[in-house]
Amino acid sequence: MKSLIYIFLLCVSTITAQTKYEQGMRKAFELWGSEKTEEASNLFERISTAEKDKWLPHYYVAQIAIIKNWKDFDNREEVTLKANLDKAQEYLNNASSITTGNAYVTYLQAQLYTVWVAHDGMKYGMKYAGKIGQMYQEIIDKHPDNPLFIAAKASWDMGSARYFGKPVTPYCEELQRAIKLFATFKPETEFHPKGSVTPYLETVKQCNE
């Protein structure tokens, strides 16, 4: 009888913990969707501290820190950019320690490196450009129909082509394929990254120029 009571209490505790996690994540996304970015990031941080085995809160803290740098990018200050990316790297490292070989963590690491390259191509291009392309190819090989990964690689390839004065058309087919896949893509769970087709609808216009 005591064993049954213990099992019951354990199950109740697990369900309660999952509910708190889910409620917290939903609230964080709600804040983010309302453009309360700092509040969302702070909540993701608190969740990551409470939920030691969950990689997604760490992922979103890192993602928010990365995205911050694209706002008013032309007027960026390296001190601020570095602080944001250092924080992002810390949380990506945390996520990696929880989930080894996770394609989404690899994707976000490539996004982080992209900010460095965009900030100073002469300084960081040689260091990160090759890694970025390799990372994207690696995750696409594992997940060939994930539109987030396909679009990111195609967009990166197009940017690289423009930088070197080459045509972007060889990458348009993959970008267009990703845009179509976004319409039917279903993330693994409610909280998994799903991306947005919106920025790529702008990028694909370059294919008609």
Region annotations inferred by a language model:
Residues 18-66:
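Start-of-domain marker
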Residues 26, 60, 67, 108, ...:
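"A position-specific structural signal for the A-helix of alpha-solenoid helical repeats
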